[in-house]
Amino acid sequence: MKMKRNHIIHLSFRTKRRRFFAMCWTTILTFLFLLPSCITEDVPDNTPMGNFEALWQIIDNKYCFFEYKNKEYGLDWDEVYRRYKNKISSEMTDKELFQVLANMLNELRDGHVNLIANHETSQYRTWYDDYPANFIDTIQRIYLQKDYVSTAGIKYQIWEDNIAYVYYESFSSGLGEANLDQVLNELSICDGLILDVRNNGGGMLTLAERLAARFTNKKILTGYISYKTGKGRHGFSSPEPIYLEPATDRVRWQKPVAVLTNRRSFSSTNDFVSKMRQLPKVVIIGDKTGGGSGLPFSSELPNGWSV
């Protein structure tokens, strides 16, 4: 009786094991059958036409400023597609394809939109090349000479009439809170401050906000932002307010400030100037900045180039 019971248990175990493996195979086969149906988008071929289509679609789905560019200078992205598609040939070389795609991107007139390949990187330079530089570093060297102080990318000096001069050349430098405390403490004896951000091509938005926060004692509305929420040219969130908050428990400057700008004040420098413009003791002097606000993204084409 005991052996019979063991035999029954053994048969039951083998039966369950067979059922278990049968279920596993059924699940795997079902998954493999359904997997191709999960791919809903066509992947462009790695051909000149495939890379052209991929690039145009990336911009069409993700670029934010179509409406503004259409009002500003009549950009029609669909017309750009038709015009540049006629320039694509299956026999063209990589360099020829690169030039056509780079020219298409330049239709956006955006300094942040670049095509990057192994042999070259495209850049739209007209946004500053067509404007006067209004910045001569020789004059700056004459004024600063050799007795200026430099820390974390900032050069500063006290000039005649008790005016402080500060030149900040890049928001990519490691500008810390302690650096700003040091600079503003040393310049606190001055009656006014010239903050020069000409030729500052941008960098980190966090540093732009960190610097601007030293010039206000209260929270202030500086603008609005919308986020891209999906594909298409009109997929944006509702505008959300942007506030500048003072740097609490830090040295803050509450005397007059003149911010010097030129066309090469770009990207996060543009955001910095936009914030400073809202402050009551700040005046902006110089050219219209180069723009370039927002957070750039990158995507890859079938041939490995990126945009």
What are the residue ranges of the model-derived segments?
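Bacterial Sec-dependent N-terminal signal peptides
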Residues: 1-45
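Alpha-helix termination/capping residues and helix-transition junctions
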Residues: 32, 187-189, 251
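Conserved acidic, small-residue-rich alpha-beta core segments centered on
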Residues: 206-307
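Flexible, low-complexity junctional segments that flank or bridge functional domains
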Residues: 38-228, 235-242, 256, 298
